[in-house]
Amino acid sequence: MTNRAWLLLLSAALSACAQKSAEEGAEPAPATVAAAAETAPTAQDGANGVAIWVHPQDGARSLILGAGGTGGLEVYGLDGALRQRIDDIEASHVTVRYGFDLGGRRIPLVLVFDPMRSQLFPYTIGDDGRLSRLSGTPVQADDDLVGLCSYTSPVSGRVYALGMTDGGQMLQWEYFTKGDAVEARLVRSVPVGKGAEYCVVDDASGTLYYGDEALGVMALPASVETDPARTVVDLAAPRGGLAAEVKGVGFVHGADGRPLVVVTDASAERFAIYGPEGGPIGRFQIGAGGAVDAVGESEGLAVAAVPMGEAYPEGILVVADQDNDGEHSNFKIVGWREARVAAGIADTAFAD
């Protein structure tokens, strides 16, 4: 699709959303849910991107992988306690792929972006729950990545990393093995405009969802064989249902199989959930509860709707909290059941 065609479509969408907003008027305040736990503060006050690794046998032993800026990658248990810190790199974004084929072994592949080096480093998670770096050449990005997600093609089984650059490009790398080393090659670059940041992919449909700080939430095909035509999920105010700054984006499948996209509506200090038809189907905010403070300024988020022990029978939502009451920022852990109930969403089921 040409830039002119895209702009014409976007203009039409903006006009339609503006008319809808004017007709609907002011919306009620979203329901509040309290975080069940919080992680230890980040070492260098850099809570940013976050990912969840689901333990294959025991969901209660799952891990939270938090990008802690200059403090490196910080690994937490579901109780929020720090289990491991990888501090020989800086970390701004992290993503996890399950079942990556390394010499005939299926392993979790963890990709971490180091903004100081502008490189993507590969790690895996051992049976003991510890992360270790894999051999191979780190990906050298041409620009700072302000968003990172990953995708496994349901057709070819190939694994990809997708990075949103500060310069307004979506870079897509295919990951593969050469002996015991993990390597990658750039397979495409798609202009998405400055402002595109956090992202997530629905593997089943091959749809990349990303937040654009100024525009709203957008989608485009993640498949390298498909024309990267963008579509609008929702727009920022005053033409859509989002505030002026969109940050983290997460994804789960509903119990009926429909995709649900969870978005950090940062300027409004709230979170929105979208269904396949577009437009928000639920909203909530994260308030104080017990010894855990409310979430204020937030950026990255991750969600996994799979049982994770008695405390989290439907999984968890994890969000970065730059306004943590402690000295440094941290990550808040919310039961997914509590979050979706607050948002008025029916039961959801994990699908990867």
Q: For each predicted feature, which ranges?
A:
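Bacterial N-terminal signal peptides
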Residues: W6-S15
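Sequence/structural signature of beta-propeller domains
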Residues: C17-D352
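Positively charged n-region of N-terminal signal peptides that target proteins for export
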Residues: M1-A5
